[in-house]
Amino acid sequence: MTTATSVSAMSPTLVVLAAGMGSRYGGLKQIDPMGPSGETILDYSVYDAVRAGFGRVVFIIRPDFEDAFRDGVAAKFSHLVDVDFAFQTLDRLPTGFSVPEGREKPWGTTHAILCARDAIRGNFAVINADDFYGRDSYAVLGKYLAGLDDTSTDWSMVGFTLRNTLSDHGTVARGVCATDANGFLMTIDEMTSIERHGAGARNTRGDGTVVALSGDEPVSMNMWGFTPRLFDHLERIFREFLTAHGDEAKSECFIPLAVGQLVGEGAATCRVLRTDSSWFGVTYREDKEIVQGSIAALVAHGEYPARLWS
């Protein structure tokens, strides 16, 4: 592993979406031990990112999580990579907008990334705090970002196969992607209630409409590669969202929908990068044992040391 001071200032930044409350899982799942020596999923994410050439990590968190993250997460690897924090709060809104009465739910991942704007320098990846993406995913995305001019609007996402990202214990939210013959994203459909169904899957929309899925569709697991040019467009999209939905108690502005809109407008392209890595995550408490077993198998096969941080 390299040290923080030896990493190039032009290395990509890893931005971690960690402000979620973990409502379905019933706890602060981002710092729940999963590895053989008490490692968290976040530990493996940072470990894989650092060995793929990422030079900084920015955690987007709620202000009341800061002490837990500094002591329970960042302290273990802050000597290896630069660590910073950005705070997502309900009242961080563009001029002219306010929080509606009774609103407690965060505004979503588009808002989270906007909250980290001042902490991001150069090209950056975005990941969920509670998803295990695998070594190859970081290598593929890190290589793409390292070779991308920071003024480019040719962005990327790592695509996983839908059937390999489902939970046996309930529904999941996935961005289901359609790509062209060259592997560029055409559309992305944020489906929020996907479950296994026969040999495939199905999603139930809010109005009760059921969408049949084969299970082979590429899906976004919120592993994205961007340049700072994203911010030229993101506040406009968030403003449009607030104008349409800002008075609602639970509506969210998802980054997959924002990217899909920009692709549709011709303002950007998004290459879907394929990976050999297996994805797994903890959506429900019952998923934890599966994740622990998967990590143990990777350690046994030499993908990771039994103790990540020495």
Task: List each language-model region with its residue ranges.
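Conserved N-terminal catalytic core of the sugar/cofactor nucleotidyltransferase
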Residues: 2-16, 22, 36-126, 133-134, ...
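A structural signal for short hydrophobic beta-strand segments in well-ordered beta-sheet cores
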Residues: 31, 176-179, 272
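Hydrophobic packing residues within well-ordered alpha-helices of enzyme cores
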Residues: 69-73, 141, 234, 291
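Conserved core of the sugar-phosphate nucleotidyltransferase
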Residues: 135-224, 228
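Catalytic beta-strand/loop signature of glycosyltransferases that borders the donor
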Residues: 218, 271-277
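A C-terminal functional module that forms or caps the active site or interfaces directly
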Residues: 234-268
